[in-house]
Amino acid sequence: MAESEVTHIRYLIVLMLFIASTFSYGDRVVLSIAAGDLSRDLHLDPLRLGYLFSGFGWAYAAAQLPAGGLLDRFGSKRIYGISIVCWSVCALLAGVTGFMAAIPAFYALFLVRLVSGFVQSPVFPGNGRIVAAWFPTSERGRASAIFNSSQYFSLVLFAPIMGWIVHAFGWKECFWFAGAIGIALAAVWFKVVHGVEAHPWISRAEINLIQQGGGLASLDAGSRPRSNTLTWSAIAWLLTQRMFVGIYLGQYCITTLTWFFLTWFPIYLTQTRHVSIVKVGFLAALPALCGFAGGILGGVVSDRLLQAGHPLSVARKIPIVLGMLLAMTMVACNYANSSTTVMLLMSLAFFGKGFGALGWTVISDTSPRDLIGVNGGLFNLIGNLAGVTTPIVLGLIVKRTGSFDYALIFVAATALLAIVAYLPVVGEIKRIERPALPGVSS
């Protein structure tokens, strides 16, 4: 291959991010699809099921900062690949808990979900870091939208499959299936993914295109361990930046929507709309497909606005605000009588959530070059506190009220709060660099 020929390896890389993220979210989908049968076997009420859903979120959120630091120190390929192997093993172990008595099985499954959340923590900080390295600024919105849309595609792909497996075999087999395909994915990951300048299939012309367009192509070329003091001082500095605080708050709100759809939405269909478990798998895929389309379209629209000459702030904020307004329409489900109307409203809300989910694009646009992994970890930590609070709060609301009406109001209110976070709080979206610290060499 001539070095002057522009290869397109960056598109292969974002495809790998999309596949890996789809499998990661697929691991989370398993529990929500299997929740009905699992709850009966383990005798779980809605609140205890909410705690089980949140087990992943506790560890996932807590591990974000260590994960970001590991990515910055040792590079994305290695840490991400190890993550895939470990979460696949956790999925296999989750299936084994089905052979235990109900009470020990609950605690064992909760522990396995904690560990799974911990080992999956590098996925999205790694995605943001890899996109920042591999893509010029003008393509970053689409690239981030592609991997971010995996959360919807995972429902489209895995909800019907897992629904059928639960119906035909049982909930244990769902976890074993997820673990087996994860191990296969890890083998492909280590073969295909490399740093920009180290990739054996890339041409010099593509490297130049990435670098000249604002991509951080040498990001993993010199990863070095750094002191904990420097890392913690960097975190403290990030938390003093109003723009980042607004972005973190917005991500928490948007992630609340994600966790509703990943955890309680299938149960809403079975308990409130009286849909069978087999049909739930297919019906849950319909709004997810709309979310997938919205996720891709949101990134495309944002990049088109940027290419048309609009400021970065305008190009990123317009899809976010419009998307959150659409997501708020789920409240109308409280007044809908037919399941068809509910599915249309949820599809519109899911489309809006996908259209507005540009948080990772904004983080790639704004993070200091030497703190992309750490800032991505902090961003994902705060965002995924919603993975802890949302399942429990919704479970508590459903248990206390006996319906999902106030649960949907709560979720829609967080979409409104996301708009507040991005409009008055964030301000101008731009990359900022950390001031040099005394006695620290660059």
Predicted regions and their residues:
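Extracytoplasmic gate region of multi-pass secondary transporters
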Residues: 31-35, 237-296, 356, 360, ...
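Central cavity-lining transmembrane alpha-helices of secondary-active solute carriers
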Residues: 54-69, 285-298
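C-terminal ends and interior cores of transmembrane alpha-helices
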Residues: 85-102, 324-337
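Hydrophobic core of transmembrane alpha-helices in multi-pass small-molecule transporters
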Residues: 90, 104-122, 340-356
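Cytoplasmic helix-loop-helix junction between adjacent transmembrane helices
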Residues: 112-152
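Helix-loop-helix hairpin linking two adjacent transmembrane segments in secondary transporters
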Residues: 147-200
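A late C-terminal transmembrane helix in Major Facilitator Superfamily
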Residues: 295, 364-401
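C-terminal transmembrane helical hairpin of 12-TM major facilitator-type secondary transporters
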Residues: 313-359
